[in-house]
Amino acid sequence: MANPEGLQVSPPPPPPPSSPSSSDTSSASSPSAPGVLGWPVPSRSSGRLVDPLEEVELQIGDAAFSLTKLLEATSAVSAQVEELAFKCTENARFLKTWRDLLKEGYDSLKPDN
């Protein structure tokens, strides 16, 4: 889902000159983990800097809301499909009955041999 504000993400600033621990070094090589080193990330709505954990929590909340709406829509469509399947079954029974009656009537009109 694209951000309508057109947020441009710039690469994180270089780490401080202090010597990083071994866990920080492995995290620093990952481009998707700027928050691991404590760098703030820009907020989607206000442009202010927010904690990466807070940003992830916001994204999880947005995803949960979207999934809830999707579940509601899926449930509504499912109910409509069940209703349509029932109607189709009833129509099939009706057509089969008519077919049988027409066949029976046709057979009764045939001359007996």
UniProtKB/Swiss-Prot annotation:
Composition-biased stretches, type Low complexity, lie in 20-34
Q: Which parts of this chain are annotated as the region Disordered? A: 1-46
Q: Any keyword Cytoplasm? A: yes
Q: Where in the cell is it found?
A: Cytoplasm
Pfam families recorded:
RCDG1
Domain of life of the organism in this record?
Eukaryota
One cellular-component annotation, GO: cytosol
- The main place the protein resides is cytoplasm
- Report TM segments: none
- Pro residues: bias regions: 10-19
Q: Which UniProt keywords apply?
A: Cytoplasm
Q: What is this protein called?
A: Uncharacterized protein C4orf46 homolog
Species source reads Bos taurus (Bovine)
